[in-house]
């Protein structure tokens, strides 16, 4: 009854108006799963391949008809008749069909769309919510949200080089309360920006993209003001997280790495100077998480950064690890970072995503389930976060429907779980001093 009878791929548009892949999988019992694939703006060079058409006369070369065709031909033919309950086997078949180390032939966007749609169809066939199907009876932890309320870098035309300034409602007692706290701070930040005569336009992930702020510290000072205006205490109720996305402004010069802050006066920092700068920031502001603080190939720098502040701060590898167990294994062996960002389309299949989360936890690393800057109404990552009891999710501000779709799904899951739902707040940082 759970055999696959149809696989349908199509081209839809994401939150930036760029084409992306959507897939329907239909089972013999009539159950249907649908999944849409996100896309990043600041992408790591080690990510799985997002197959684009490169036809400049159509969507500026960003069409995905090649990937859609791969879904509707090769992948469909390989999966028809397979049992949707055999997720690992289905993903294995697609990886073997692709025959490349980075999914460059069929496209990670094609493979992931099918992988997620299969899981959703299987869950529907069994009459289970997706998080319960993926994680089992112990799936009960609602994640601490990292709410990106101020955008910079590649995500916005603002005056800061760091890409994301996030707040974490660590003092909340439930996910619902966390959402309220985050929304209130976000709205107060908007009022402050408006009063300062600055822009309240938002970036790709729904955070404000002001043009008049004075660099990184100016952004942190504004957010601190907004937290206080909302009636919350810095460090106790709300903590900060940064996504530097350093690979976007990192240059290798004579075997060493330099970081060029073009939007902040043209400052250039070495790896050691970056580490010192981060130390100064965490001593001044309640920053408990720094993502991609150094370039994706600056392994020695990552080890230094982790030794310097890894006992006090979550050091998250995004471009460094790209949700890839081989790169994560290297990081664990070297002592680079203490946390991994989980982006499903970086690796391109559900099975490999779950493997990365499991490897991280076994090594004492935390895992942060994440959206991409180009999103859709698909809320799968909300279910993945609860299924794996990951403890943290990063999915934008309380603005833009493509971001709110994930938060609203988590609110529904919390309601469904009822009294067994857990929200652990500050305790999700189990590998640092709190």
Swiss-Prot record:
- Any one of the GO CC terms: extracellular region
Q: Where in the cell is it found?
A: Cytoplasm; Secreted; Cell surface
State the EC number(s).
4.2.1.11
Reactions catalysed, as given in the entry:
(2R)-2-phosphoglycerate = phosphoenolpyruvate + H2O
Q: Name one Pfam family in it.
A: Enolase_C
Q: What is its main location?
A: cytoplasm
MF terms from GO for this chain are: magnesium ion binding; phosphopyruvate hydratase activity
Pathway linked to the protein: Carbohydrate degradation; glycolysis; pyruvate from D-glyceraldehyde 3-phosphate: step 4/5
Q: Which cofactor does it need?
A: Mg(2+)
Annotated residues that bind (2R)-2-phosphoglycerate are located at: 163, 343, 372-373, 394
GO BP annotations of the record are:
glycolytic process
* SMART domains in the record: Enolase_C (SM01192), Enolase_N (SM01193)
For the keyword Nucleus, the answer is no
Q: Which keywords does this chain's UniProt record carry?
A: Cytoplasm, Glycolysis, Lyase, Magnesium, Metal-binding, Secreted
As for what it does, the entry says: Catalyzes the reversible conversion of 2-phosphoglycerate (2-PG) into phosphoenolpyruvate (PEP). It is essential for the degradation of carbohydrates via glycolysis.
HAMAP family in alphabetical order: Enolase
Q: Which family does it belong to?
A: Belongs to the enolase family.
**The protein, known as:** Enolase
């Amino acid at each position: 009854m759970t055999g696959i009878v149809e696989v349908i791929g199509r081209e839809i548009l994401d939150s930036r108006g760029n084409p992306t892949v959507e897939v329907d999988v239909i089972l013999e019992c009539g159950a249907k799963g649908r999944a849409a694939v996100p896309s990043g703006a600041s992408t790591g060079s080690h990510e799985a391949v997002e197959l684009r058409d490169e036809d400049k006369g159509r969507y500026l070369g960003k069409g995905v008809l090649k990937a859609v065709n791969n879904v509707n031909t090769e992948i469909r033919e390989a999966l028809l008749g397979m049992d949707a309950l055999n997720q690992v086997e289905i993903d294995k078949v697609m990886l073997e069909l692709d025959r490349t180390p980075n999914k460059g032939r069929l496209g990670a966007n094609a493979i992931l769309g099918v992988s997620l749609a299969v899981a959703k169809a299987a869950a529907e066939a069994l009459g289970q919510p997706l998080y319960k199907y993926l994680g089992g009876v112990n799936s009960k932890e609602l994640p601490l949200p990292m709410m990106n309320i101020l955008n910079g870098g590649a995500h916005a035309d603002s005056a800061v080089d760091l890409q994301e300034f996030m707040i974490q409602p660590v003092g909340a007692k439930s996910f619902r309360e966390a959402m309220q706290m985050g929304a209130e701070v976000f709205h107060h930040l908007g009022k402050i920006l408006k009063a300062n005569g600055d822009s309240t336009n938002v970036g790709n992930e729904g955070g404000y993209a002001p043009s008049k702020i004075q660099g990184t510290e100016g952004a942190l000072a504004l957010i601190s003001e907004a937290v206080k205006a909302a009636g919350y205490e810095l460090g106790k109720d709300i903590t900060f997280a940064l996504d530097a996305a350093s690979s976007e402004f990192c240059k290798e010069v004579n075997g060493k790495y330099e970081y060029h802050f073009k939007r902040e006066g043209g400052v250039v920092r070495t790896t050691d100077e970056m580490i010192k700068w981060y130390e100064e920031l965490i001593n001044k502001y309640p920053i408990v998480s720094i993502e991609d603080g150094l370039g994706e190939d600056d392994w020695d720098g990552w080890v230094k950064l982790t030794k310097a502040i890894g006992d006090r701060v979550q050091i998250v590898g995004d471009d460094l690890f790209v949700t890839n167990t081989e790169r994560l294994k290297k990081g664990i062996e070297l002592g680079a970072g203490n946390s991994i960002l989980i982006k499903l389309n970086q690796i391109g299949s559900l099975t490999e995503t779950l493997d990365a989360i499991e490897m991280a936890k076994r090594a004492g690393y935390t895992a942060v389930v994440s959206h991409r800057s180009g999103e859709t109404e698909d809320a799968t990552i909300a279910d993945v976060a609860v299924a794996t009891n990951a403890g943290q999710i990063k999915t934008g501000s309380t603005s833009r429907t493509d971001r709110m779709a994930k938060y609203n799904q988590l609110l529904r899951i919390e309601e469904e779980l009822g009294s067994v739902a857990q929200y652990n707040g500050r305790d999700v940082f189990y590998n640092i001093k709190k």
